[in-house]
Regions:
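Conserved phosphate-binding elements of NTP-dependent enzyme cores
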Residues: 1-174
Length: 174
Protein backbone atom coordinates (compact mmCIF):
# COMPACT_ATOMS: atom_id res chain seq x y z
CA UNK A 1 0.00 0.00 0.00
CA UNK A 2 2.89 2.36 0.71
CA UNK A 3 4.26 1.73 -2.80
CA UNK A 4 0.87 2.67 -4.26
CA UNK A 5 0.88 5.80 -2.11
CA UNK A 6 4.27 6.83 -3.47
CA UNK A 7 3.12 6.32 -7.05
CA UNK A 8 0.01 8.40 -6.43
CA UNK A 9 1.95 11.12 -4.62
CA UNK A 10 4.15 11.37 -7.73
CA UNK A 11 1.05 12.14 -9.81
CA UNK A 12 0.41 8.70 -11.29
CA UNK A 13 -2.94 6.97 -11.70
CA UNK A 14 -3.41 3.38 -10.57
CA UNK A 15 -5.94 1.00 -12.11
CA UNK A 16 -5.87 -2.34 -10.35
CA UNK A 17 -7.96 -5.48 -10.80
CA UNK A 18 -8.43 -6.67 -7.25
CA UNK A 19 -10.53 -8.86 -4.96
CA UNK A 20 -8.71 -8.28 -1.66
CA UNK A 21 -11.19 -6.44 0.56
CA UNK A 22 -8.49 -4.49 2.42
CA UNK A 23 -7.23 -3.10 -0.89
CA UNK A 24 -10.78 -2.38 -2.06
CA UNK A 25 -11.51 -0.52 1.19
CA UNK A 26 -8.36 1.60 0.71
CA UNK A 27 -9.04 2.68 -2.88
CA UNK A 28 -10.33 6.07 -3.98
CA UNK A 29 -12.68 4.81 -6.67
CA UNK A 30 -14.25 1.38 -7.13
CA UNK A 31 -15.70 -0.04 -10.34
CA UNK A 32 -17.63 -3.31 -10.09
CA UNK A 33 -18.54 -5.31 -13.18
CA UNK A 34 -21.01 -8.15 -13.39
CA UNK A 35 -23.52 -8.97 -12.21
CA UNK A 36 -22.19 -12.44 -12.98
CA UNK A 37 -19.57 -13.85 -15.36
CA UNK A 38 -19.61 -14.70 -19.05
CA UNK A 39 -22.79 -13.77 -20.92
CA UNK A 40 -24.34 -12.61 -17.63
CA UNK A 41 -21.48 -10.15 -17.08
CA UNK A 42 -20.00 -7.20 -18.88
CA UNK A 43 -22.15 -4.49 -17.34
CA UNK A 44 -21.38 -1.78 -14.84
CA UNK A 45 -22.89 -2.91 -11.53
CA UNK A 46 -21.55 -0.27 -9.13
CA UNK A 47 -19.04 2.57 -9.06
CA UNK A 48 -17.89 5.26 -6.68
CA UNK A 49 -15.92 5.53 -3.45
CA UNK A 50 -15.96 2.24 -1.51
CA UNK A 51 -17.87 3.84 1.35
CA UNK A 52 -20.69 4.54 -1.12
CA UNK A 53 -20.53 1.22 -3.01
CA UNK A 54 -20.76 -0.76 0.25
CA UNK A 55 -24.31 0.57 0.74
CA UNK A 56 -25.60 -1.24 -2.37
CA UNK A 57 -26.68 -4.82 -2.99
CA UNK A 58 -23.92 -6.00 -5.35
CA UNK A 59 -21.57 -8.90 -4.59
CA UNK A 60 -18.81 -6.47 -3.54
CA UNK A 61 -21.15 -4.37 -1.39
CA UNK A 62 -22.30 -7.44 0.52
CA UNK A 63 -18.72 -8.72 0.86
CA UNK A 64 -17.51 -5.34 2.19
CA UNK A 65 -20.27 -5.18 4.81
CA UNK A 66 -19.72 -8.80 5.91
CA UNK A 67 -15.95 -8.26 6.09
CA UNK A 68 -16.31 -5.10 8.17
CA UNK A 69 -18.76 -6.86 10.47
CA UNK A 70 -16.31 -9.77 10.90
CA UNK A 71 -13.59 -7.25 11.78
CA UNK A 72 -15.90 -5.62 14.30
CA UNK A 73 -16.15 -2.44 12.28
CA UNK A 74 -19.77 -1.38 12.22
CA UNK A 75 -19.01 2.04 10.75
CA UNK A 76 -18.50 3.21 7.14
CA UNK A 77 -15.16 2.70 5.41
CA UNK A 78 -13.82 6.23 5.88
CA UNK A 79 -14.54 6.21 9.59
CA UNK A 80 -13.09 2.73 9.91
CA UNK A 81 -9.93 3.94 8.16
CA UNK A 82 -9.43 6.40 10.99
CA UNK A 83 -9.11 3.58 13.51
CA UNK A 84 -5.57 2.80 14.61
CA UNK A 85 -3.84 -0.18 13.00
CA UNK A 86 -1.85 -2.64 15.08
CA UNK A 87 1.47 -1.33 13.77
CA UNK A 88 3.01 2.05 13.06
CA UNK A 89 4.58 3.56 9.94
CA UNK A 90 6.55 6.75 9.51
CA UNK A 91 5.00 9.58 7.55
CA UNK A 92 7.50 10.36 4.80
CA UNK A 93 5.71 13.44 3.48
CA UNK A 94 5.64 16.29 5.99
CA UNK A 95 2.88 17.99 4.00
CA UNK A 96 0.50 15.15 4.89
CA UNK A 97 1.17 15.24 8.63
CA UNK A 98 -1.40 17.98 9.41
CA UNK A 99 -4.11 15.87 7.73
CA UNK A 100 -3.52 12.83 9.92
CA UNK A 101 -4.84 14.32 13.13
CA UNK A 102 -3.63 15.63 16.45
CA UNK A 103 -2.76 12.21 17.90
CA UNK A 104 -0.42 11.27 15.04
CA UNK A 105 2.61 13.40 14.26
CA UNK A 106 5.30 12.63 11.70
CA UNK A 107 7.86 12.18 14.48
CA UNK A 108 5.98 9.49 16.39
CA UNK A 109 4.55 7.69 13.34
CA UNK A 110 0.96 7.21 12.27
CA UNK A 111 -1.25 4.20 11.83
CA UNK A 112 -1.28 2.79 8.32
CA UNK A 113 -5.04 3.34 8.06
CA UNK A 114 -4.64 6.99 9.10
CA UNK A 115 -1.89 7.46 6.52
CA UNK A 116 -4.04 5.88 3.79
CA UNK A 117 -6.97 8.13 4.73
CA UNK A 118 -4.77 11.23 4.75
CA UNK A 119 -3.38 10.45 1.32
CA UNK A 120 -6.84 9.66 -0.05
CA UNK A 121 -8.23 12.94 1.33
CA UNK A 122 -5.30 14.87 -0.15
CA UNK A 123 -5.79 13.25 -3.59
CA UNK A 124 -9.51 14.03 -3.52
CA UNK A 125 -8.78 17.63 -2.57
CA UNK A 126 -6.20 18.05 -5.35
CA UNK A 127 -8.42 16.35 -7.94
CA UNK A 128 -11.30 18.68 -7.09
CA UNK A 129 -9.05 21.67 -7.88
CA UNK A 130 -7.40 20.22 -11.00
CA UNK A 131 -8.36 21.78 -14.34
CA UNK A 132 -8.90 19.87 -17.56
CA UNK A 133 -9.45 16.19 -18.05
CA UNK A 134 -9.92 14.63 -14.65
CA UNK A 135 -10.89 11.17 -15.89
CA UNK A 136 -9.99 8.49 -18.39
CA UNK A 137 -13.15 8.10 -20.43
CA UNK A 138 -14.15 4.68 -21.74
CA UNK A 139 -17.04 5.03 -24.17
CA UNK A 140 -19.22 2.21 -25.52
CA UNK A 141 -16.74 -0.57 -24.71
CA UNK A 142 -17.91 -3.80 -26.31
CA UNK A 143 -14.89 -6.10 -26.56
CA UNK A 144 -15.40 -9.69 -25.40
CA UNK A 145 -18.43 -9.67 -23.09
CA UNK A 146 -18.59 -5.91 -22.36
CA UNK A 147 -22.02 -4.65 -23.33
CA UNK A 148 -21.53 -1.11 -24.63
CA UNK A 149 -20.17 0.07 -21.29
CA UNK A 150 -19.21 3.70 -20.72
CA UNK A 151 -17.32 4.64 -17.57
CA UNK A 152 -15.04 7.41 -16.31
CA UNK A 153 -11.93 6.35 -14.38
CA UNK A 154 -10.52 9.21 -12.27
CA UNK A 155 -6.95 10.33 -13.03
CA UNK A 156 -4.44 10.61 -10.20
CA UNK A 157 -6.46 8.22 -8.05
CA UNK A 158 -6.21 4.69 -6.72
CA UNK A 159 -8.85 2.90 -8.83
CA UNK A 160 -9.92 -0.71 -8.31
CA UNK A 161 -11.88 -2.78 -10.82
CA UNK A 162 -13.58 -5.77 -9.25
CA UNK A 163 -16.28 -8.30 -10.05
CA UNK A 164 -16.85 -12.02 -10.33
CA UNK A 165 -14.73 -14.19 -12.62
CA UNK A 166 -15.55 -13.55 -16.27
CA UNK A 167 -17.32 -10.24 -15.64
CA UNK A 168 -15.06 -8.23 -17.98
CA UNK A 169 -12.54 -6.73 -15.55
CA UNK A 170 -9.43 -7.45 -17.61
CA UNK A 171 -11.11 -6.38 -20.83
CA UNK A 172 -12.02 -3.02 -19.31
CA UNK A 173 -8.56 -2.53 -17.82
CA UNK A 174 -6.70 -3.29 -21.03
Amino acid sequence: MRAFGKLLDAGNSIILIEHNLDVIRACDWLIELGPEGGDAGGTLVAYGPPEQVRLGSSHTAVALREYEQALGLDVPVLQAAERAATYQVQVDDAALAPHIGPDHSAEEGASLQALIKARRDKRRELAAKAPGHSAIEVVNAHENNLKGMSVNIPRGKFNVITGVSGSGKSTLAF
